[in-house]
């Protein structure tokens, strides 16, 4: 029954954080719902809702308007503004959903891991991926990258392993096969 509860744990199903059974098994057995935990959960949930509804949705609406401009109506500055707005919209969308899931979990006595750690202040691409959808990166590392040999293989296989994880991460985030093969949706 504990495993069934884990499988059906709705707060983290939609956008993460990805919680492994081993990490939540003890919490299922001995979780405690407290007023303080419920309050912290409400704070996380509200923060996530603000990120999603106020920031992500608004930025997305502005981006759609910029994207609808013709080449004559648009400039390089407008295109760059659109690109920045889109990256911020994606961040606020994903991290908002994650914060709402963390908050709901906390309200029910669970402690889910943080999923985003300010990725846009990263100092390198590697640092960015360590901060972006962290539980997904951990999952792909443990269940795909390491079983393929990780970086303890030849350079060619290491590159292959990185490309496989990169491609699967794209699929996870909604990129279809056409996008992966031809950069088209």
Predicted regions and their residues:
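Membrane-embedded transmembrane alpha-helical bundles that form the catalytic cores
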Residues: 1-184
